[in-house]
């Protein structure tokens, strides 16, 4: 018997949920659906019920679940050489480094594993650049972040958050952070002008995902870029959720026609098969960190490198940015046509969208998502009254229309 499968017994959803509650730390509040298998835009629970996936593991499976090309790359490389650590060179990483930098038009990549690691790495890079290149006085560097941001769960990252549920009773937090309103270039310039000699970086999500798919004013990111150039500050674009075709462009910052100083990638860079992340930037910034001063055992592994190249191939070869743009416009138009008192607003870009539920409506976003699941569609609330809707980018027009019908049916069931 396969030693792995011998440890995985046939259990009901109820049994598995209870088992997890007993033996795993309570860090999430999941919709009570237990995945057993997944393919493309669909997942199946342990009772074999099929669902449309409209969360995509927070946009980690843009290429669809278990894309055969990415799975094949993983299996082939895993059977050959999965891990070398960066103590030695390996055959695949140098080729991946060349591939991804040329793919996005940057000079260098720093490979990590999780999105939060990429964010932490960018903070270290920005600070180091500030001290070495800009001449900021030692231990005086400032990073600007936005209220409503979500960049991860590590101590450094939650220090940039203004959400008490992220940082409460985890202090002391990291110093050297100034938080400004998202979508306010006026506040950005005020802080930059007041602390011009101390600010090393401004980290921003092109669209705030966890905040509820908050789309800034047109041209916001371009103005931020111009201000950062004016005050000699690094613009760091967290594209971990918004990048890789999700919003209808390869990077969401492409909508503004800019090239951030640092770009952070994660999630869909592996097609959902492995934790892989990357920081892209110019040599002027990247080479401020010397050998032995930063790293990761698994970052840049042969396995991660092969998987990431396959995942990026799929995004481009299957024109997933174009599909996201076209179907996103169609989806928002269809959802906006649903006349229901609970729907306060529909917003988004590409296939990163959200329905804002009127907080005074008698049914919560959670209740609506539970009803979605009962009808074969999986989505998750964020910030109590917002439902994020982000299917794999491989979804078809016919499937989008099927899902719109499910969404309409669920809202209609709450009319009375």
Swiss-Prot record:
This protein's pathway: Amino-acid biosynthesis; L-proline biosynthesis; L-glutamate 5-semialdehyde from L-ornithine: step 1/1
Annotated GO CC locations = cytoplasm
- Which pairs of positions does the record mark as disulfide bonds? none
Instruction: Identify the InterPro entries for this entry.
Output: Aminotrans_3, Aminotrans_3_PPA_site, Class-III_PLP-dep_AT, Orn_aminotrans, PyrdxlP-dep_Trfase, PyrdxlP-dep_Trfase_major, PyrdxlP-dep_Trfase_small
Gene3D superfamilies given for it? Aspartate Aminotransferase, domain 1 (3.90.1150.10), Type I PLP-dependent aspartate aminotransferase-like (Major domain) (3.40.640.10)
- This enzyme's EC code(s): 2.6.1.13
List all membrane-crossing ranges.
none
| Compartment(s) of residence | Cytoplasm
The protein's UniProt keywords, in alphabetical order, are: Aminotransferase, Cytoplasm, Pyridoxal phosphate, Transferase
- Report the cofactors: pyridoxal 5'-phosphate
One of the entry's Gene Ontology molecular-function terms is: identical protein binding
The reaction(s) this protein catalyses:
a 2-oxocarboxylate + L-ornithine = L-glutamate 5-semialdehyde + an L-alpha-amino acid
Where are residues bearing N6-(pyridoxal phosphate)lysine located in the sequence? 267
Asked whether the UniProt record includes Transferase among its keywords, one would answer yes
A GO BP annotation: arginine catabolic process to glutamate
The name this protein carries in UniProt is Probable ornithine aminotransferase
Q: What class of enzyme is it?
A: transferase
**Coiled-coil stretches noted in the UniProt entry, renumbered to this chain:** none
| Chief subcellular location | cytoplasm
Q: Which family does it belong to?
A: Belongs to the class-III pyridoxal-phosphate-dependent aminotransferase family.
Question: Gene that codes for this?
Answer: oatA
């Amino acid at each position: 018997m396969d030693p792995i499968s011998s440890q995985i017994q046939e259990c009901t959803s109820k049994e598995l949920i209870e088992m997890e509650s007993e033996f795993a730390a309570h860090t999430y509040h999941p919709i009570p659906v237990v995945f057993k298998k997944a393919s493309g835009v669909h997942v199946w629970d342990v009772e074999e019920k099929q669902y449309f996936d409209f969360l995509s593991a927070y946009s980690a499976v843009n290429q669809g679940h278990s894309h055969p090309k990415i799975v094949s790359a993983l299996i082939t490389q895993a059977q050959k050489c999965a891990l070398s650590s960066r103590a030695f060179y390996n055959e695949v990483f140098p080729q991946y480094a060349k591939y991804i930098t040329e793919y996005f038009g940057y000079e260098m990549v720093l490979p990590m594993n999780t999105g939060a690691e990429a964010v932490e790495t960018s903070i270290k890079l920005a600070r180091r650049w500030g001290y070495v290149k800009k001449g900021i006085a030692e231990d005086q560097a400032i990073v600007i972040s936005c209220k409503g941001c979500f960049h991860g769960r590590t101590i450094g990252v939650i220090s940039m958050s203004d959400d008490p549920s992220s940082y409460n009773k985890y202090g002391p937090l990291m110093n050297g952070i100034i938080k400004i309103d998202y979508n306010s270039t006026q506040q950005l310039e005020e802080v930059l002008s007041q602390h011009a000699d101390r600010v090393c970086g401004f980290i921003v999500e092109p669209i705030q995902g966890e905040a509820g798919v908050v789309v800034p004013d047109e041209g916001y990111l371009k103005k931020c870029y111009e201000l950062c150039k004016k005050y000699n500050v690094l613009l760091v674009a967290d594209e971990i959720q918004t990048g890789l075709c999700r919003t209808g462009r390869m990077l969401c910052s492409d909508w503004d026609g800019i090239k951030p100083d640092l770009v952070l990638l994660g999630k869909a860079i592996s097609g959902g098969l492995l934790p892989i992340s990357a920081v892209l930037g110019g040599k002027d910034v990247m080479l401020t960190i010397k050998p032995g001063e930063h790293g990761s055992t698994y970052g840049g592994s042969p396995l991660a490198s092969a998987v990431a190249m396959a995942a990026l191939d799929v995004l481009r070869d299957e024109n997933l940015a174009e599909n996201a743009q076209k179907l996103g416009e169609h989806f928002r138009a269809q959802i906006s046509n649903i006349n229901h008192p609970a729907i306060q607003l529909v917003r988004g870009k590409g296939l990163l969208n959200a329905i804002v539920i009127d907080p005074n409506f008698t049914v919560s976003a959670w209740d609506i998502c539970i009803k979605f699941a009962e009808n074969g569609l999986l989505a998750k609330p964020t910030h109590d009254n917002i439902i994020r809707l982000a299917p794999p980018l491989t979804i078809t027009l016919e499937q989008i229309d099927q899902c719109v019908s499910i969404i309409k049916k669920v809202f209609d069931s709450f009319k009375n």
